[in-house]
Regions:
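Bacterial N-terminal signal peptides that target proteins for export
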Residues: 1-11
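C-terminal motif of bacterial Sec signal peptides marking the signal peptidase cleavage site
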Residues: 19-23
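N-terminal "mature-domain start" segment
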Residues: 24-68, 137-139
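Stable alpha-helical elements in mature extracytoplasmic
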Residues: 29, 33, 94-98, 102, ...
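Sec/Tat-exported extracytoplasmic proteins
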Residues: 37-41, 93, 106
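Short, surface-exposed beta-strand/loop micro-motifs that present aromatic residues
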Residues: 61-78, 114-122
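A short acidic-to-branched-hydrophobic micro-motif
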Residues: 77-96
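A short, solvent-exposed beta-edge/loop patch
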Residues: 107-139
Length: 139
């Protein structure tokens, strides 16, 4: 009986961990992410032509890029820029292959903002980075 309870407990912990990790990522559909960001008053660009064409020249199958920015005030009243960039690839293999290229883009953007920054993260066929608040708004 003790073994059963331990296994059940570990299983529940694993399920909770998966749910927590999955809730950190933006929406897996570009249109849903765009709608959520617009609702949160972000300026949003959903690009399915120019940036994907550039990535295709590099050998990557990118379908959409959602970029959003918003100027806000922090707790001390300072002006801060919230930013999120979400790359939607055709499949997980393309996302993994392009991850280092996305990291280069993220470094450039990280220098522009000193806010709570989330480094590039791979989630299924998406790669995203930006500030914590902007990523949360993209759900």
């Amino acid at each position: 009986m003790k073994t059963f309870v331990r296994i059940l407990s570990l299983t529940l912990v694993a399920v909770m961990l998966c749910a927590t990790l999955a809730s950190c990522a933006p929406a897996s559909d570009p249109a849903k992410a765009e709608a959520a960001l617009k609702e949160a008053e972000y300026i949003v660009l959903n690009d399915s032509t120019i940036t994907p064409a550039v990535f295709k020249l590099g050998g990557y199958d990118l379908t959409n890029v959602v970029t959003a920015t918003k100027t806000a005030e922090d707790k001390e009243g300072n002006t801060v820029v919230e930013l999120v960039v979400i790359y939607y690839f055709a499949d997980k293999d393309n996302a993994e292959k392009a991850f280092s290229k996305v990291e280069e883009d993220a470094k450039e953007k990280a220098e522009q903002t000193k806010e709570t920054w989330v480094a590039p993260t791979l989630s299924g066929s998406m790669v995203y980075f930006g500030t914590k608040n902007a990523i949360k708004a993209a759900k």
